């Protein structure tokens, strides 16, 4: 994944206006059971500000998490776009597990499990677990957000093991550094930073690398943005 792209990895359809985002009702056909599913989609989103170092976007886009996952109450399938087709036999064991439709973090986690079962550990499964963590951040549930960050980090490990391009992409390491630093896994953050030194060469990545090194050495587990890198490094 190119470094110029990863800064915008979570972007959904956005229109830059002065208005708050709108919600559109829609009906889609479930990609597993072929039944109609009523969904709500966030549109006309204005994003102003700097993204977090773990890729979470600035407001208003950061406030649309519950509209970034869709759930079929008929079969239990969930995915960012419920119309994505999948073979039920590969994910049936996941769909049969009980889940609360309004537990947004659990829906993201189920989508990650579906991706792993249907394909393999990937950047998508990493991001889905990370979004589950963001939901728990907003709910002030530190224990659950830490659990989901650990799962996200493990997915990135597995993804980079199987993908040669992914494991030589500097921003993958820097994103994962932020994920593990936030949960206080300083040892793993240091190991990742040592590898990131080899690959974090493009654009703003060297600045983020230096910033993360300071945070890790200070055992700082706080949330920071790209803007913080540019201002606090000066």
Give the location of each predicted region.
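Alpha-helical linker/edge segments of TPR/alpha-solenoid repeat scaffolds
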Residues: 175-188, 213-234
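Boundary/linker segments of alpha-helical solenoid repeat arrays
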Residues: 159-169, 198-213
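Amphipathic alpha-helical repeat scaffolds of TPR domains
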Residues: 84-97, 105-140, 167-182
